[in-house]
Curated annotation (Swiss-Prot):
Top enzyme class: lyase
Gene3D superfamilies per UniProt: Hotdog Thioesterase
Keyword presence, Lyase: yes
Family membership noted in the UniProt record: Belongs to the thioester dehydratase family. FabZ subfamily.
Protein's name in the database: 3-hydroxyacyl-[acyl-carrier-protein] dehydratase FabZ
EC number: 4.2.1.59
Localization: Cytoplasm
UniProt lineage: Bacteria, Pseudomonadati, Myxococcota, Myxococcia, Myxococcales
One GO CC term, this protein: cytoplasm
Length: 156
């Protein structure tokens, strides 16, 4: 069992759903295992053959779409921002992705892999957060990118 598989959850999927608007099948973070406010977060996503995207990408040789690996990193980045603030600061707020730079894909992610999603804050000014994200499987980098996001009022 890998080191990341043995780590205890800081936040499980029920807690994650209280902070993110995403729901299955588009919720791509299973649990948070490390967190330092305003600095860094590590989350995990177990990739199974039951993921709906594997029905068409690609049936004979299933590979997780790179854009969904980036989405998983963006969801981890949103968790880092919302968990870093006080509950009254994020009440009725939603995190919107504003940009992705420097996205790179290093190797395929396949059923049975466990994605480790590590995000770090590089800059924060007001409601805008800049972060770097690295996705790994078994310690090997599978994808990386820089993200910019903003916490905004939820529409009612």
């Amino acid at each position: 069992m890998s080191e990341s598989a043995e780590r205890k959850s800081i936040l499980d999927v029920v807690g994650i759903q209280k902070l993110l608007p995403h729901r299955p099948p588009f919720l791509l973070v299973d649990r948070v295992v490390e967190f330092e406010a305003h600095r860094r977060l590590v989350a995990l996503k177990g990739v199974t053959m039951n993921e709906p995207f594997f029905q068409g990408h690609f049936p004979a040789q299933p590979v997780m779409p790179g854009v969904l690996i980036l989405e998983a990193l963006a969801q981890a980045a949103a968790l880092l921002a919302t968990m870093s603030l006080q509950p009254d600061e994020v009440k009725d707020k939603i995190t919107y992705l504003m940009g992705i730079d420097g996205a790179r894909f290093r190797r395929p992610v396949v059923p049975g892999d466990r994605l480790e999603l590590e995000v770090e804050v590089t800059k924060q000014k007001g409601a805008v957060w800049k972060q770097t994200g690295v996705a790994r499987v078994d310690g090997q980098v599978v994808a990386e990118a820089e993200f910019m996001a903003m916490l905004a009022d939820r529409e009612r």
